Amino acid sequence: MDGLRKLAVAAIAVLAVPPLFSQPGVVGTDSGKLQGVTQGSVESFKGVPFAAPPVGELRWRAPQPVQQWSDVRAANAYSADCMQVPFPSDAAPLGTKPAEDCLYLNVWRPAGTNADAKLPVMFWIYGGGFVNGGSSPAVYDGSKFAEKGVVLVSANYRLGRFGFFAFPELTKENADGMVGNYGFMDQIAALKWVQKNISAFGGDPANVTVFGESAGGFSVSMLLTSPLSQGLFSKAIIESGGGRTNLGGQRYLNTALPNGPASAESVGIEFARSVGVDATGKDALDKLRHLSAEQVLGNLNMATMNQPGYAGPFIDGRVVLSDPQSVYLSGAGWHVPLMIGTNSMDIGFGFARDKEELFAPFGNDREKAIAAYDPTGKGELRTVQYQVSMDRFMVEPARFVASIFASEGLPAYEYRFSYVAKSMRSKWPGAPHATEIPFVFDTVQAKYGSELAPEDEKIAQAMLNYWVSFARTGDPSTANTPAWPRYSTATDMLMDFTENGPVAEKDPLKARLDVTAAYVTSSAPAPAPKLPARP
């Protein structure tokens, strides 16, 4: 009882102290003036529209301009996240109720920043398999970046069938090729907003770093390889975002490869049939646009991603030229400094019935694969299969992308996040997918609450400093952190975030990744033809 009384008194004391909020100066954008909120040393502007609401006749269209407003607009709360079926075990639970009207962004900056400050800008892209996610989760709060002198921007983008949908009539309606990958178009539109407006917030439009995790990392790969993102950013960070393939496989707009997934248009036609719309009817598209948001949404979320009707990115030839690997190898894409990495217990999956089936695809390198992944022959199938699939899907592709950038003389830095929060060490043998995010944002208090340990905070502060330094200079190393060596194939060095702190080391998974690289290279699709040259 005594402990409960102390908690009650503490709670009353907290409630009795007014929050340190005040009204900052008004900021003007190309659409109108904004009034944000100051909390301590940080000013935030939330729920800022960067495109017209994509509803009604604007459903399944490229983002359109915002209607200007004349009064000062209050920018004091997150807008709705984009339409989705929330995922119960999401590592970043939403802070708002999803809605179709969702194309809004958020800005954090140091309080009192002048318009001519030219601070580095960081643009965050959330993950969620392109069917979940949003900018409102507490772990994505940009305040700690602002405290370090960064202007941080996060933006919503359309998800699921709202963000990634193809249909024959849509293709005919958009002769310019801006069809299907609306979620990516939203990201590009938000980055264009940054170029036009961020200087009013004290940010430098010539120093923008895009960074994202999982689907957000795949999105950064898209931005690095899309001709439509030219000049919109100057650095990139990919967290657990693959790098060789598109999420969802080698799906095309209206064709399908042998043994590949159905075309995006075929998926759209099947969806129309499922809601009683004749895909060949003259009014089919009109009927689809008049469906309720709930009808379009269906049951898509991260738990149903393996269903045939998954609505994710596809190759359209305009926004998405090809799979990232083909674009990188063809010499197309954008020359920028890069940070890239994965977690020590990142995404892995597989369906092999035994080890014979698991290692058979390695062909002539089968014995090398066994030596790398199961040297004693006593490893559990589930564990070995997980490591093989994790390396194939996440870890080796990250090294591949780092090697491509390094070979072109670009600064490339690879990391591995092995740190496990102290309160989770009895449950997790390694760092699962997405667990680095609260450490990058230094929002570990929001994530772990009373279970937060001092060593957790120390790693969070180190990671935040590395990310900020990279955004500021293109080099993550700082005077107060261990030096982070540039990646090269000759040294294979990376920065591992461990329970002992950041450790620069030669990649201990090199043998595994070498044999996996040989396999994925031999089984990769042919490079796409006629890709534009990298400028």
Label each PLM-derived region with a short phrase.
Residues 87-279, 318-322, 326-353, 407-410, ...:
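Serine-hydrolase-like catalytic core of hydrolytic proteins
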Residues 9-10, 20:
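Cleavable N-terminal signal peptides
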Residues 158-161, 211-215, 416-423, 482-488:
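Short, solvent-exposed turn/loop segments enriched in Gly/Ser/Thr/Pro and often Arg
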Residues 66, 275-287:
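Short, charged, surface-exposed loops that flank catalytic or proteolytic processing sites
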